[in-house]
């Protein structure tokens, strides 16, 4: 069944991270540029996939990539925190709600995203799997802006501190696998295997493009 497009909430794909733990042959690699499935990069895979669910998908990054897509450029060159991308997105897009997702979480199902986007009476609605909170798979409301401004001003870049002190709620999901974060090469290889199994029809029916 075709996924209905989410028209009223833009999706911002957070791709401004450092990839410091993603190492191949002792060299840190920008994981956004790692190939995935039939796509030349994780960035293109995520962008293309999310466009099937959201009418508007924007990439938040330190720089533009070769991929032809709308970008929100983070101006804080030497500082790495998703809070910069989130803050910049609200200031630029001027919209009440924004769904944020990290580039390195390519297995999150459309069904889970739709559940998160359907709960709109909190400043932040984020996913929680059996073992971990996933603050960067989340729906944010502009009411967070004052607290976000203060957080950046005081240089407390801990995402958990901001969210726990805000009007937030965690939505619990049972499947750990779909929230796999590609921090390392081993994580990436596991995701490749999971997507391959999905393509063979054994699982993940609603999660691949």
From Swiss-Prot:
One of its GO terms (molecular function) is GTP binding. Its cofactor is Mg(2+). It comes from the Bacteria. GTP binds at residues 14-16, 31, 104. Its main location: cytoplasm. Keywords: Cytoplasm, GTP-binding, Magnesium, Metal-binding, Molybdenum cofactor biosynthesis, Nucleotide-binding, Transferase. InterPro entries: MobA-like_NTP_Trfase (IPR025877), Molybde_CF_guanTrfase (IPR013482), Nucleotide-diphossugar_trans (IPR029044). Mg(2+) binds at residue 104. It catalyses: Mo-molybdopterin + GTP + H(+) = Mo-molybdopterin guanine dinucleotide + diphosphate. Its EC number is 2.7.7.77. GO terms for biological process: bis(molybdopterin guanine dinucleotide)molybdenum biosynthetic process. It is an enzyme of class 2 (transferase). SUPFAM superfamilies: Nucleotide-diphospho-sugar transferases (SSF53448). GO terms for cellular component: cytoplasm. The N-terminal domain determines nucleotide recognition and specific binding, while the C-terminal domain determines the specific binding to the target protein. Transfers a GMP moiety from GTP to Mo-molybdopterin (Mo-MPT) cofactor (Moco or molybdenum cofactor) to form Mo-molybdopterin guanine dinucleotide (Mo-MGD) cofactor. HAMAP family: MobA. Belongs to the MobA family. This is Molybdenum cofactor guanylyltransferase. The gene is mobA.
């Amino acid at each position: 069944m075709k996924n209905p497009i989410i028209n009223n909430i833009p999706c911002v794909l957070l791709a401004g991270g450092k990839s410091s733990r993603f190492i191949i042959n002792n060299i840190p690699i920008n994981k956004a540029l790692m190939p995935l499935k039939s796509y030349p990069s994780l960035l293109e895979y995520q962008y293309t996939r999310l466009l099937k669910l959201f009418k508007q998908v924007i990439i938040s990054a330190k720089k533009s990539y070769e991929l032809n897509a709308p970008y929100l450029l983070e101006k804080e060159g030497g500082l790495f925190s998703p809070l910069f991308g989130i803050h910049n997105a609200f200031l630029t897009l001027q919209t009440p709600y924004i769904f944020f997702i990290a580039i390195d979480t390519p297995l999150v199902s459309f069904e889970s995203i739709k559940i998160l986007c359907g709960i709109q009476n909190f400043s932040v609605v984020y996913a929680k799997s059996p073992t971990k909170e996933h603050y960067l798979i989340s729906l944010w409301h502009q009411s967070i802006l004052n607290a976000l401004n203060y957080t950046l001003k005081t240089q407390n870049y801990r995402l958990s501190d901001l969210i726990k002190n805000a009007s937030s709620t965690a939505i619990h999901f049972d499947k750990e696998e779909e929230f796999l974060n590609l921090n390392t090469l081993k994580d990436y290889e596991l995701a490749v295997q999971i997507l391959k199994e999905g393509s063979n029809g054994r699982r993940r029916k609603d999660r691949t493009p």
